[in-house]
Amino acid sequence: MFDVTPLENLFIEEYMLRAPGDFVKVYIYGLRLCYHPVEDATVPAISRALGLEEKTVLDAFAYWERVGVLRRIADNPPAYSFFNLKEAMLTGKAEG
């Protein structure tokens, strides 16, 4: 809880400013879970933590996948890999 989750300035400038607010919440919370895993990182758990409908959480992940900042790596249950945006921009490859 007292640790840090790095949020790239590139995300803020290129993606956050155009995204719906609830989708930004999902991205930042998901990024936090990448750096500080918890036992229950399911869509229902994320939904409860953020006070959002599960559909909103799933829509948010689908949105972020479409814009290219993460990718879905499993379907049941859904799991995602977040990209290093600077590396993806410099190399032209997105790797999570």
Predicted features and spans:
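Long, low-complexity, charged/polar intrinsically disordered regions in eukaryotic proteins
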Residues: M1-E14
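Winged-helix/helix-turn-helix nucleic-acid-interaction surface
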Residues: K55-G96
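Detector for short helical micro-motifs
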Residues: I12-E53
